[in-house]
Amino acid sequence: MAFKVKILGAGSIGNHLGHAARVLGWDVDICDMDEAALERTRTDIYPARYGAWDEEIHLFPVEQAPVGDYDMICIGTPPDSHIELALKALEERPRALLVEKPLCGPDLHQAQKLFEMAENCDTQAFVGYDHV
């Protein structure tokens, strides 16, 4: 069975994450609260970057997105939503959680809560920050 990934956010980052996951042969669901963003992903952003839309990627409005049974959940939404969505994503108990930078604002209490919750869920939590 293929590795299953849910990507929250159908903007630039969501498209990059979706393409990278498909290159690895993973099953990909992209979810967004804005149905117009999902349509832009399918008809504009993804095809412009990668040559054509990948019919193996499934698009869902957030309220219709499948819940649970994901190996990984990736969060590529606007920064002010990261920590809230990450905490909610952990309720699905994925094997791994990737949150794009920044994880949270300057108050690190929520970050500590996230890592404690991830540990209790046996989920590996990562922050996407690759500037070295």
Language-model-detected regions and their locations in the chain:
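N-terminal Rossmann-like dinucleotide-binding module
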Residues: 1-51
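Phosphate-coordination loops involved in phosphoryl transfer and adenosine-cofactor binding
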Residues: 2-4, 70, 94
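Amphipathic, non-transmembrane alpha-helical secondary structure
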Residues: 15, 19, 35, 39, ...
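Short acidic low-complexity segments
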Residues: 54-70
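Beta-strand-loop-alpha-helix segment that lines the small-molecule cofactor/substrate pocket
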Residues: 72, 83-130
